Design a protein with these regions (language model features):
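S1/OB-fold single-stranded RNA-binding interface
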Residues: 1-201, 205-213, 219, 223-227
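Electropositive polyanion-binding surfaces
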Residues: 120, 125, 130-132, 172-368
């Protein structure tokens, strides 16, 4: 456990002293939870003190029901997640203040010299210089004006700023990307060549990074071969490289309602690693053989090179399966495979449901 200083040179385990340490997650600016590996503590808005979303905090447990439902108050900010806060600017006669939209709930005092030209009621970014105490309010400087707080694009920009996201990459990463090249013939020879197969990608209409592709074949004995190929990013991103380190820091791509904050530069995610039609692409392939009842009887995983035959969308695949004349003619080279896919998918779905699987048919939100 974690040690904390109690008094003078005396220490105790924080948990035994009624304290816990974890990351503060503020929900709708009304309450928060401090989460650790084996606990979750509810914190009411009035008990945030100077803590803000993403801070590592120390909480004192004020209520503990049956050891499960804990409630507490923030007594110390151990480490700031960020020194920036998003809020709405309010002007007074000789100064201004910012009302945080997703933070500790205390207004931030802005000296007049830092807000002379800032429009009233706009969403702004504040860099906090002083986090406040029992006598003084937090104080800071406005470093960016985002715009109308009710504008969708502005709200998305605020979200990006709040969570420390960035669409930009550092120069070292950009240099590495610029030096990357398509696969050579020698590199292709080291992989299993699947370019003769009519493999397809199936994605949404707006997808840019096509990272997986499929192929299905039915044998005369009733067995099915299913190939699932995913982009082999490791062909281009080597361990310990600037790209590798940046991807580790980002963790994943972030999908917002109107854009994607990529884990890799777009030259890689939408270019070299995107399984675009009629281009040689490095992939990992899982090859599976199912019998007529959907039982997996064999499988293999290997590095491969593919050349997708078509960039399909869910809409167009459904049109082919529905017998749409235009789509059937357009995709005559792969239409029969879609019916084989449908056949196998029904068999596998039946097995999934027997195992208790649940399908969530959730709508996709899009800004129009």
């Amino acid at each position: 456990g974690l040690l904390g200083r109690v008094k003078g040179d005396r220490y105790c385990l924080l948990e035994e002293g009624g304290y816990l340490q974890g990351s503060l997650e503020i929900i709708k600016n009304k309450f928060a939870f401090v989460d650790g590996p084996e606990f979750s503590v509810f914190v009411p808005r009035s008990k945030f003190n100077t803590a803000t979303h993403g801070d590592e905090v120390l909480v004192k447990i004020t209520e503990d029901k049956d050891g499960k439902k804990k409630e507490g108050e923030v007594v110390k900010v151990v480490k700031r997640g960020s020194n920036r806060v998003i809020g709405i600017f309010e002007r007074s006669k000789n100064f201004g203040f910012v009302v945080p939209t997703h933070s500790f709930g205390k207004d931030i005092y802005i000296p007049n010299k830092f807000c002379v030209d800032v429009p009233n009621k706009k969403l702004v970014v504040v860099e906090v210089d002083f986090w406040g105490d029992a006598e003084r309010k937090p104080e800071g400087r406005i470093i960016d004006i985002l715009g109308d707080p009710f504008d969708t694009n502005v709200m998305i920009e605020a979200l990006i700023e709040r969570d420390g996201l960035s669409e930009e990459f550092n120069m070292e990463v950009k240099r590495e990307v610029k030096a990357l090249r398509e696969m050579t013939e020698e590199e292709i020879k080291e992989k299993r060549d699947l370019r003769h197969l009519p493999i397809v990608t199936i994605d949404g209409d707006d997808a840019k990074d096509l990272d997986d592709a499929v192929y299905v074949e039915k044998f005369p004995n009733g067995n099915y071969k299913l190939l699932v190929s995913i982009a082999d990013v490791s062909h281009y991103v080597k361990s310990g490289s600037a790209l590798d380190k940046e991807a580790y820091l980002r963790g994943n791509s972030v999908y917002l309602v109107d854009r994607v904050i990529p884990m890799f530069p777009r030259e890689l995610s939408n270019g070299l690693c995107s399984l675009n039609p009629n281009e040689n692409k490095a992939t990992f392939t899982c090859e599976m053989i199912f019998d007529e009842n959907g039982k997996l009887i064999d499988h293999d995983v290997y590095k491969s090179v593919i050349k997708t035959a078509e960039r399909m969308t869910y809409t167009n695949v459904n049109k082919v399966l529905a017998g749409d004349t235009e789509m059937t003619e357009r995709y005559a080279n792969v239409k029969d495979m879609f019916f084989t896919m449908l056949e196998l998918s029904k068999i596998l779905r039946k097995i999934k449901r027997k195992r208790g699987s649940i399908d969530f048919d959730l709508p996709e939100i899009k800004v129009i």
